[in-house]
Amino acid sequence: MLKDIHQHRILILDFSSQYAQLIARRVREIGVYCELMPCDIDEETIRDFNPHGIILSGGPETVTLSHTLRAPAFIFEIGCPVLGICYGMQTMAYQLGGKVNRTAKAEFGHAQLRVLNPAFLFDGIEDQVSPQGEPLLDVWMSHGDIVSELPPGFEATACTDNSPLAAMADFKRRFFGLQFHPEVTHTPQGHRILAHFVIHICQCIPNWTTKHIIEDSIRDIQEKVGKEQVIVGLSGGVDSAVTATLVHKAIGDQLVCVLVDTGLLRLNEVDEVLNVFQKHLGAKVICVDAKDRFMKALKGISDPEEKRKIAGEQFIRVFEEQAKKLNVKWLGQGTIYPDVIESAKTKTGKGHIIKTHHNVGGLPLNMELKLIEPLRELFKDEVRKLGLELGLPADLIYRHPFPGPGLAIRILGEVNAEYINILKQADAIFIEELKKSDYYHQVSQAFAVFMPLKSVGVKGDARHYGYIIALRAVKTVDFMTAQWADLPHEFLSKVSHRIVNEIKEVSRVVYDMTNKPPATIEWE
């Protein structure tokens, strides 16, 4: 019997927290569907979503300032359990009649939490026990404000040396507040605390599993498509691979895969992708040579957003032409949840655009094909789990992500054939050395970036002006936040040496040491 994977659901209201997506991932790991929405979402949208519980994220603001964000007041009146985390706890306390003040000593980092009342959230959870027999937890703090006076109906359920009210609860109304961050790995018992809220307090049934997601996706594809054909664009990445596999599992020979050779793929990628999909998927694969088309469309374009939109436009036009030849009505795309969030295309359209993804905001408005996006609700780690469950090879599943517009957004400014050729070679050297040194699977994404600037160097006995190549490698789980990869200097030196010696047009190699945030993973 098919499970309704969306029946039990948690709503996360985001107060611009750097950890908001991490909260969502933790809830998904518990096995319950959740969505992330802006904290100023309208009442109708929340009621339509019909959550079993609501989580208020942390945030960078100070609650007591008049202009700062507030939780929608009605959520405290609908009988739904609410969990406030950090800023979320503070705004809940403030809005319900408590007091919030600046703390004399801000807490950032590790703290030891003393549990005063373990009921519900802390039941059976401890890292240590105090001499008085009280449960002690190691937690991660990041705050400069504290709840100084509880709202009516609340009691203190935990404290730290610097925060007498480090956790609070109104058991009757099922409102809970945590001053610390249970979603981060630095709070070892955080997963269990969130599970207590989601499973025991909100009484959600954990139906959000890989097996159930696959079953639901197949059913959804079959119901939407019927007997019609679907065209899926392949890029060599995990998202398009899992999309194609899901669609193929749902409708079999009604699927036609199209690999568009844009001229902007990595070195030898066209042959590699064709080999993988014809061997492992057994689906019909058409390769379209569109190199001239893409180069002509991108000529003279330097703006990153324009390049993304042009790439999206050209992809769709190629697919539409192939679809007309084959009488196909549907386009399957590997859009995933982080694409949706970053493109600010949530269900309400609210949010600030970080960058437009070519398969979200970059799609033309007059597109003739109907869209099917089976991965749209999934984070990258969930997509990979699906791929493994579907039997795709691990090398493909854990291949580093590659953007839809390809090397066009790894070349700063205008794209031309010379720049593409240089970048392909540099990127291939970097990836080859990562694999030879067994670092490839220790980082989540790695690539080279071409900078159309010339820097002076010396080759032989002569001065040499050549281009600059930047190397980027990051570690991440969900691609919403990322840390730059601290690769050994000896390794980076070897890669740099090869690039400047094997590519005569390059005179300098630099390494990007910026996290996300503040930077994005891609340079454009």
UniProtKB/Swiss-Prot annotation:
Domain GMPS ATP-PPase: 208-399
Enzyme class: ligase
Taxonomic superkingdom: Bacteria
SUPFAM superfamilies attached to this UniProt entry: Adenine nucleotide alpha hydrolases-like, Class I glutamine amidotransferase-like, GMP synthetase C-terminal dimerisation domain
Residue stretches making up the Glutamine amidotransferase type-1 domain: 9-207
Pathway noted in the entry: Purine metabolism; GMP biosynthesis; GMP from XMP (L-Gln route): step 1/1
Residues where ATP binds: S235, G236, G237, V238, D239, S240, A241
Pfam families xrefs: GATase, GMP_synt_C, NAD_synthase
Gene3D superfamilies linked to this entry: 3.30.300.10, 3.40.50.880, HUPs (3.40.50.620)
Cross-referenced CDD domains: GATase1_GMP_Synthase (cd01742), GMP_synthase_C (cd01997)
GO CC, alphabetical: cytosol
PANTHER family, per the entry: GMP SYNTHASE [GLUTAMINE-HYDROLYZING] (PTHR11922:SF2), GMP SYNTHASE-RELATED (PTHR11922)
Protein name in the entry: GMP synthase [glutamine-hydrolyzing]
Taxonomic lineage of the native organism: Bacteria, Pseudomonadati, Pseudomonadota, Gammaproteobacteria, Legionellales
